[in-house]
Amino acid sequence: MAKVNLYISNDAYEKINAIIEKRRQEGAREKDVSFSATASMLLELGLRVYEAQMERKESAFNQAEFNKLLLECVVKTQSSVAKILGIESLSPHVSGNPKFEYANMVEDIREKVSVEMERFFPKNDDE
């Protein structure tokens, strides 16, 4: 194992010490959470992240093209489902049942989507 001396900022030093202290409070043994071992682990993790970013830059993945394709598929799906709902609401098997009237189905879908979206994107008081 190579030995390296390096200088780090006080902020980084304090954060590493906080990690060590937290792990000790969680019951880790003194020798398992030394400053050297923790700093080495963080350095290796940082190197993996750096290498992954470099690989991503070299890949042919185009985020804008992916977003465009994804949006196109979502719009096609939305349009198709709207037509299917319209057809289904005219079925004699469900006629007279307000639950299957087109306007009610659309409103029900919007409410359910709103609840799910709120889970992932909570509304701020500013909005």
Swiss-Prot record:
The keyword Transcription applies. One of its GO terms (cellular component) is cytoplasm. Keywords: Conjugation, Cytoplasm, DNA-binding, Plasmid, Transcription, Transcription regulation. It is found in: Cytoplasm. It comes from the Bacteria. InterPro entries: IHF-like_DNA-bd_dom_sf, TraM_DNA-bd, TRelaxosome_TraM. Pfam families: Tra_M. The keyword Methyltransferase does not apply. GO terms for molecular function: DNA binding. Belongs to the relaxosome TraM family. Conjugative DNA transfer (CDT) is the unidirectional transfer of ssDNA plasmid from a donor to a recipient cell. It is the central mechanism by which antibiotic resistance and virulence factors are propagated in bacterial populations. Part of the relaxosome, which facilitates a site- and strand-specific cut in the origin of transfer by TraI, at the nic site. Probably autoregulates its own expression. Plasmid specificity is conferred by the TraD-TraM pair. NCBIfam families: PRK13713.1 (NF010267). Homotetramer. 2 homotetramers cooperatively bind to DNA although they do not contact each other; cooperativity is achieved by DNA kinking and unwinding. Part of the relaxosome, a complex composed of plasmid encoded TraI, TraM, TraY and host-encoded IHF which binds to the F plasmid origin of transfer (oriT) in a site- and sequence-specific manner. Interacts with TraD. Also interacts with TraY. This is Relaxosome protein TraM. It comes from Escherichia coli. The gene is traM.
